[in-house]
């Protein structure tokens, strides 16, 4: 008996010795080419770069992996306990590998296999860290052995808290979220500190199968997994029975980021992305660096600008009438047939519908959700002139675009025309809003910064400014009659015409500008000379190399909305150089400022993620560089206010504000423009086809683009005071006759003359600048200041 027992012990000892030897050999063999796990001590995870508006609203997030790093000390214990209960019960006691857990899982999986249940894993949190950071997902014995060896080694080097920090920040949780902080934001719009027990358990349940555990698609499975984690938390002593019951009883309610916390500005965000990548000279740093970027964007103005542009494009498009239905489908199974159709691009808030029946007075429609509604004929009148019956416009089975309005629907169509709008602070250059097109998802081409177009009459402003700079007086008479320009050897003569083909005879330079008379502009240009006009076009940044031909004075040069709006911003600020900019401040992931546009000391500029409502200073920098003298600049500003008061921008008078502005229409009405400004804001807008073609025989900046400006200003500035433009000391205001330009006691227009060239004028009719404000809008006494 003793011999048998002794023999058994010997065999057992030999087996142990062999096992130890084999284990030692395996460890020795696989320890030579292990990855360098010391890199874990230098963990520097790629993080999300966020772009914010000036008032702290999130514009966009960029990342290769959407991750928000959170130090382990900031992770609440309830969230940590959820993961321990779900993934690794013995995490705090085992040396990186859980031998008891492996044995337990082996026996449990035999039972699970026999009963067709899900197999249990035995990987510890430490092993998952090793797999995520240092090894591949290859299924092999060699990889598993290396995983075990490294797990044991790093458990001897790193603390449990360090290992947890790596795990909680690196793990993928679905919906593009890496790390618990990103998961909390993605699923619940909360920080990790705000999560409830039930929400913590939900997040802890995700790593097993993040792509499959989607509450929207498989709610019962997701809830069962979450409830399992909650039960484990109770069994492990982390929560009480009452807490467990309450948590299990709570539904899974996912929350998106609140609308008031964000602002849609796709074109703006793309401009910022490109600009910051250029500044950093690194796409990698932009997408991985966890930057916080504060922009100049004003969330309210951005939304209003987008709304006004879309409204204007839609209204102009409807003037051409209804083109045709998208398709025609059989009505036997209309809902399914409607679902099969590809969703039209740029549908936005519009809906797809099918005509189920038509009568003289309305169309009955079906929507993709199966609901039915009506379109009254009054909501189709735009589609065809003198529409008497819906039957002449639509038929059964027609697929159309509709817009929900009060108590019914309206017939709509997606505009083919496109456009852009840009809003600037003329003193600082801050781009407060920028919308580069009708819909970014359809076309990422930015018509603010990328579209080169002919500005038409917008360029006239700078022809007249060149004349004023060179001493031409605003009341000088020019003839609005036929003219032939001899352009030189080998060049054909040029015979420009007015827009409507008429001639109005003699008029002052001011009147010629206000009425946007082409022939007056050409005569002013001949008086000044093309060299000076080319110089001013370059000086104002409209075009760096304009072709020196006379047609340029009527807008044949090419420019972008950004460039021409900035040129008008220079006029609006009194003639000082300014450049449009989108980015105010950039911080790295640690809050260190790596770029600030305004380098003056600012005690409120260290903005952390939790403190983004801090405002950026708006105090304008004084710039010693003057683009034009203040007297000439004021004179052209006076002309531009006149263009609103009695010229082509007359419709803007309904705003009841002091506004300066100019319309623009290129040859054949292919491009239409309007740029308007007050002492505080400049708004530039443009409408045209991406492939240039005529907008219509009667399409002009006045009737196509000016309504967009008016709609924007009516909403953005309706409560703002009407501020006049400051009259410089170098200007004297004199009453003159609008028609003859001569000084008369009760002149019909108050003209701005330079002090140094009015000696020959009769002093009897000079008006003290301080006395003029009782009856002349748009003028500001020198004693007043504009901020």
From Swiss-Prot:
State the compartments where it is located: Cell inner membrane
Active-site residues are 87 (proton donor), 457 (acyl-ester intermediate)
Listed pathway(s): Cell wall biogenesis; peptidoglycan biosynthesis
**Topological domains annotated Cytoplasmic:** 1-6
Lineage of the species this protein comes from: Bacteria, Pseudomonadati, Pseudomonadota, Alphaproteobacteria, Rickettsiales
The record's principal subcellular location, in a coarse class, is membrane
For this protein, what reaction is catalysed?
[GlcNAc-(1->4)-Mur2Ac(oyl-L-Ala-gamma-D-Glu-L-Lys-D-Ala-D-Ala)](n)-di-trans,octa-cis-undecaprenyl diphosphate + beta-D-GlcNAc-(1->4)-Mur2Ac(oyl-L-Ala-gamma-D-Glu-L-Lys-D-Ala-D-Ala)-di-trans,octa-cis-undecaprenyl diphosphate = [GlcNAc-(1->4)-Mur2Ac(oyl-L-Ala-gamma-D-Glu-L-Lys-D-Ala-D-Ala)](n+1)-di-trans,octa-cis-undecaprenyl diphosphate + di-trans,octa-cis-undecaprenyl diphosphate + H(+); Preferential cleavage: (Ac)2-L-Lys-D-Ala-|-D-Ala. Also transpeptidation of peptidyl-alanyl moieties that are N-acyl substituents of D-alanine
> Transmembrane stretches, by residue range?
7-27
According to its UniProt entry, the function of this protein is described as: Cell wall formation. Synthesis of cross-linked peptidoglycan from the lipid intermediates. The enzyme has a penicillin-insensitive transglycosylase N-terminal domain (formation of linear glycan strands) and a penicillin-sensitive transpeptidase C-terminal domain (cross-linking of the peptide subunits).
Which regions of this chain are Periplasmic-facing, per the record's topological domains? 28-787
Under which name does UniProt file this protein?
Answer: Penicillin-binding protein 1A
Q: Where is this region: Transglycosylase?
A: 49-220
UniProt keywords (A-Z) are: Antibiotic resistance, Carboxypeptidase, Cell inner membrane, Cell membrane, Cell shape, Cell wall biogenesis/degradation, Glycosyltransferase, Hydrolase, Membrane, Multifunctional enzyme, Peptidoglycan synthesis, Protease, Signal-anchor, Transferase, Transmembrane, Transmembrane helix
């Amino acid at each position: 008996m003793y011999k048998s027992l002794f023999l058994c012990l010997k065999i057992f000892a030999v087996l142990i010795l062999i096992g130890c030897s084999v284990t030692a050999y395996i460890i020795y063999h696989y320890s030579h080419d292990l990855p360098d796990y010391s890199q874990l001590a230098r963990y520097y995870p790629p993080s999300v770069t966020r772009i914010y508006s000036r008032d702290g609203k999130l514009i966009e997030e960029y990342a290769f992996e959407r991750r928000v790093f959170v130090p382990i000390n900031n992770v609440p214990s309830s969230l940590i306990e959820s993961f321990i209960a779900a993934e690794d019960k013995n995490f705090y006691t085992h040396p990186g590998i859980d031998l008891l857990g492996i044995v337990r899982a082996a026996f449990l999986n035999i039972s699970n296999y026999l009963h067709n249940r899900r197999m249990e894993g035995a990987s510890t949190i430490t092993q998952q860290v090793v797999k995520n950071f240092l090894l591949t997902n290859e299924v092999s014995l060699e990889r598993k052995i290396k995983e075990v060896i490294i797990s044991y080694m790093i458990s001897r080097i790193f603390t449990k808290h360090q290992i947890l920090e790596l795990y909680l920040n690196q793990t993928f949780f679905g919906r593009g979220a890496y790390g618990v902080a990103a998961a909390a934001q993605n699923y619940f719009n909360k920080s990790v500190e705000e999560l409830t027990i039930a929400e913590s358990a939900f997040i802890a349940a995700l790593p097993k199968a993040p792509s499959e555990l989607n509450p929207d698609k498989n709610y019962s499975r997701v809830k069962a997994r979450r409830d399992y984690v909650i039960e484990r938390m109770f069994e492990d002593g982390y929560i009480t029975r009452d807490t467990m019951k309450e948590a299990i009883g709570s539904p899974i309610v996912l929350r998106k980021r609140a609308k008031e916390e964000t602002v849609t500005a796709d074109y703006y965000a793309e401009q910022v992305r490109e600009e910051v990548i250029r500044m950093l000279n690194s796409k990698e740093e932009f997408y991985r660096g966890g930057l916080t970027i504060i922009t100049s964007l004003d969330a309210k103005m951005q939304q209003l600008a987008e709304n006004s542009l879309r409204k204007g494009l839609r209204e102009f498009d409807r003037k051409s009438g209804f083109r045709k239905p998208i398709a025609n489908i059989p009505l036997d199974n209309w809902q399914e047939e409607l679902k099969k159709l590809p969703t039209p691009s740029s549908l936005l808030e519009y809906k797809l519908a099918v005509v189920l029946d038509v009568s003289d007075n309305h169309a009955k429609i079906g929507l993709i959700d199966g609901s039915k509604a009506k379109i009254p004929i009054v909501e189709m009148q735009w589609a065809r002139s003198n529409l008497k019956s819906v039957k002449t416009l639509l038929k059964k089975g027609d697929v159309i675009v509709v817009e929900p309005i009060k108590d019914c629907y309206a017939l709509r169509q997606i505009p083919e025309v496109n456009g852009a709008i840009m809003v600037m602070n003329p003193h600082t250059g801050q781009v407060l809003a920028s919308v580069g097109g009708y819909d970014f998802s359809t076309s990422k081409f930015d018509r603010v910064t990328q579209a080169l177009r002919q500005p038409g009459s917008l360029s006239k402003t700078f022809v007249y400014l060149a004349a004023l700079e060179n001493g031409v007086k605003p009341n000088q008479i020019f003839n609005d009659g036929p003219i032939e320009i001899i352009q030189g050897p080998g060049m054909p003569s040029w015979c420009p015409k007015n827009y409507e083909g008429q001639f109005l005879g003699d008029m002052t330079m001011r009147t010629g500008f206000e009425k946007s008379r082409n022939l007056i502009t050409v005569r002013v240009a001949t008086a000044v000379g093309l060299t000076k006009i080319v110089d001013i076009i370059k000086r104002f940044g409209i075009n760096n190399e304009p072709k020196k031909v006379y047609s340029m004075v009527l807008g044949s040069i090419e420019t972008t909305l950004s460039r021409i709006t900035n040129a008008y911003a220079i006029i609006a600020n009194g003639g000082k150089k300014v450049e449009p900019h989108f980015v105010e401040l950039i911080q790295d992931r640690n809050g260190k400022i790596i770029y600030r546009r305004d380098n003056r000391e600012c005690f409120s500029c260290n903005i952390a993620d939790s403190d983004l409502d801090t405002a950026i200073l708006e105090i304008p920098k004084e710039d010693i560089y003057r683009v034009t003298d203040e007297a000439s600049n004021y004179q052209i500003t006076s002309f531009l206010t006149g263009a609103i008061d009695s010229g082509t921008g007359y419709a803007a008078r309904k705003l009841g504000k002091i506004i300066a502005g100019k319309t623009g229409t290129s040859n054949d009405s292919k491009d239409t423009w309007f740029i308007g400004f007050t002492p505080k804001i400049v708004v530039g807008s443009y409408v045209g086809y991406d492939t240039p073609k005529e907008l219509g025989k009667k399409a002009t900046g006045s009737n196509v683009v000016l309504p967009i400006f008016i709609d924007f200003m009516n909403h953005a500035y309706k409560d703002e005071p009407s501020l006049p433009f400051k009259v410089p000391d170098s200007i004297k205001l004199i009453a003159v006759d609008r028609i003859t330009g001569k000084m008369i006691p009760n002149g019909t227009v108050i003209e701005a003359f330079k002090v140094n060239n009015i000696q020959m004028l009769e002093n009897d009719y000079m008006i003290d600048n301080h006395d003029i404000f009782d009856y002349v809008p748009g003028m500001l006494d020198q004693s007043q200041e504009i901020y």
